[in-house]
Amino acid sequence: MRSHTGEEELRRRLRLIHLLHQTNPYPTGSGSANQRRQKRRRWRQRWQQLLALADRIYSFPDPPTDTPLDLAIQQLQNLAIESIPDPPTNIPEALCDPTENSRSPQA
């Protein structure tokens, strides 16, 4: 009976990992080249976080039966994906102004 519960626990963890992977689909091809590049970069960052989280879920030990449920819940709440901030939408004027090029020699 113990091996049956172990198999069920493994199936539950694998379903959870599968659900995590489904929540991060590969980005679509719309937008400019730079926008597509940024989308892929952010997707790759989220993917790395999901892989790390899935590894932690898979290797997370079962709580012992004598451990209080609150402690087990607290340990599970520590498993979280960090939010990745979006890049700024507008570029500062100092970077956009071609007349102020610091590399050009002053005549």
UniProtKB/Swiss-Prot annotation:
Which segments does the entry list as coiled coil? none
Pfam hit, one: REV
Q: Name one GO molecular function term.
A: RNA binding
Motif Nuclear export signal: list the residue ranges. 69-81
Protein location:
Host nucleus, Host nucleolus; Host cytoplasm
Is Secreted a UniProt keyword of this protein?
Answer: no
Q: Which GO terms describe its biological process?
A: mRNA transport
**Polar residues bias locations:** 21-34
> Which residue intervals make up region (Disordered)?
21-41, 83-107
List, alphabetically, the GO terms of the cellular component aspect.
Answer: host cell cytoplasm; host cell nucleolus
- Residues of the region (Homomultimerization) are 16-24
List the ranges annotated as motif Nuclear localization signal and RNA-binding (RRE).
32-48
Q: Write out the domain note.
A: The RNA-binding motif binds to the RRE, a stem-and-loop structure present in incompletely spliced viral pre-mRNAs. This region also contains the NLS which mediates nuclear localization. These overlapping functions prevent Rev bound to RRE from undesirable return to the nucleus. When Rev binds the RRE, the NLS becomes masked while the NES remains accessible.
Protein name according to UniProt: Protein Rev
Please name the source species: Simian immunodeficiency virus (isolate Mm142-83)
Which gene produces this protein?
A: rev
